[in-house]
């Protein structure tokens, strides 16, 4: 498939992990039907404090009841965000915990360290559950024709004139 720009229109915020500034953005509702947001990498960073690539780790730490993902019991949004800002991935968090001079043990409370130690399996499994797989074996090809090749301009213009769609008629002429 040639590289193309993709806008995912979804109310499921899990799709934000697919955002990348090269080609993928997510269009979603913010509040109500008229307040919308188009997320690129910067917008994801502004909302969460880290990039879209860390959203599965965030979900692995804090869980997500709406998706029945457990996470680490006792770890909420704020702590999960700070852990990701400091260590990035769940793998890095647990790698640090196993070192002799753990940065985590000196930067976070003993309670957080204990929760992470007890919740390691839940964190790792929750991350797996919260990750959208990108390796599904699919085949896709773009059609050979462009969409405008099938438009019968005379019929479209007659309809637009009948319905008094002047601007739409002009836009159609410009697009075909």
Please name every model-derived segment.
Residues 1-137, 170:
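Extended two-metal-dependent nuclease catalytic cores across DNA- and RNA-processing enzymes
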Residues 115-118, 128-176:
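Low-complexity, acidic/Ser/Thr- and charged residue-rich accessory regions of DNA metabolism proteins
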């Amino acid at each position: 498939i040639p590289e193309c720009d993709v806008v995912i229109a979804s109310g499921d915020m899990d799709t934000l992990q697919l955002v990348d500034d090269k080609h993928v953005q997510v269009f979603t509702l913010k509040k109500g039907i008229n307040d919308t947001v188009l997320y690129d990498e910067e917008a994801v960073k502004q909302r969460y404090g880290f990039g879209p690539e860390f959203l599965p780790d965030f979900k692995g730490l804090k869980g997500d009841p709406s998706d029945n993902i457990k996470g680490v019991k006792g770890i909420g949004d704020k702590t999960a965000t700070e852990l990701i800002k400091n260590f990035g991935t769940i793998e890095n968090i647990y790698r640090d915990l196993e070192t002799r001079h753990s940065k985590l043990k000196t930067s976070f409370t003993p309670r957080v360290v204990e929760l992470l130690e007890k919740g390691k399996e839940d964190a790792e499994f929750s991350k797996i559950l919260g990750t959208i797989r990108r390796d599904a074996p699919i085949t896709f090809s773009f059609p050979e024709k462009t969409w405008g090749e099938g438009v019968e301009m005379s019929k479209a213009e007659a309809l637009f004139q009948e319905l008094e769609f002047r601007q739409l008629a002009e836009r159609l002429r410009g697009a075909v």
